[in-house]
């Protein structure tokens, strides 16, 4: 009974394989099956003169730091891989750290000098600003006084116009008075100018 079942199991996979046909997805097209409708204009193009290809050829190649460790690369087990010396890497890192420390000190020194200079400039600007404010207040007072002078000048001009209109009337009125009651001729000039 057990031998019959094992013989049946062995014969079944062969029967399945013989009846199954390969799927069309697995069937690959051959070059004879491809029909080219039009060749196109790419055939006449010269690849060696293509600027993109020239730029790609000018790119330098780079090798990894540890050779033999590229992805997908298989190396024999007995091949000795190149390794970085830890002491040299440590010395490189310490030297780089020292360089960064020196740069940081130089930047901090320059930064402190700039902060000090900025504070000095702020103090100078504040002093200058207060001085200019005081000067502006003084000039505002001067402007008020000049405005008052202008107002007084306008008032004096109006007074002068009134006097110029009044003096002829006084002369006319004085000429109408009798000889004994007439006044001296009215004049706005000082006595010294009249005597000269």
Swiss-Prot record:
Alphabetical UniProt keywords: Lipoprotein, Lysosome, Membrane, Myristate, Phosphoprotein
Positions of N-myristoyl glycine lipidation: 2
Pfam families according to UniProt: LOH1CR12 (PF10158)
Gene Ontology BP, a term: regulation of endosome size
Record flagged with keyword Membrane: yes
InterPro entries in alphabetical order: TBORCS5
Region annotation (Disordered) ranges: 1-32
GO annotations of cellular component type: axon; BORC complex; cytoplasmic side of lysosomal membrane; intracellular membrane-bounded organelle; membrane; plasma membrane; synaptic vesicle membrane
Name the UniProt record assigns to this protein: BLOC-1-related complex subunit 5
Organismal lineage: Eukaryota, Metazoa, Chordata, Craniata, Vertebrata
Record gene name: BORCS5
């Amino acid at each position: 009974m057990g031998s019959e079942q094992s013989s049946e199991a062995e014969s079944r996979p062969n029967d399945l394989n013989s009846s199954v046909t390969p799927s069309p997805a697995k069937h690959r097209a051959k070059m004879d099956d491809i029909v080219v409708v039009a060749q196109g204009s790419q055939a006449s193009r010269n690849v060696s003169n293509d600027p993109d290809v020239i730029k790609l050829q000018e790119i330098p190649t780079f090798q990894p730091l540890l050779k033999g460790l590229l992805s997908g690369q298989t190396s024999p087990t007995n091949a000795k891989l190149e390794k970085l010396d830890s002491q040299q890497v440590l010395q490189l890192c310490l030297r780089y750290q020292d360089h960064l420390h020196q740069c940081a000190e130089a930047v901090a020194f320059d930064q402190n000098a700039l902060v000090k200079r900025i504070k000095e400039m702020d103090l100078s600007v504040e002093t200058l600003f207060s001085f200019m404010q005081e000067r502006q207040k003084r000039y505002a007072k001067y402007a008020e006084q000049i405005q008052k002078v202008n107002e007084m000048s306008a008032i004096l001009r109006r007074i002068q116009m009134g006097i110029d209109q009044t003096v002829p009337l006084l002369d006319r009125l004085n000429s109408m008075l009798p000889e004994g009651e007439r006044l001296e001729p009215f004049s706005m000039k000082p006595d010294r100018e009249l005597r000269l």
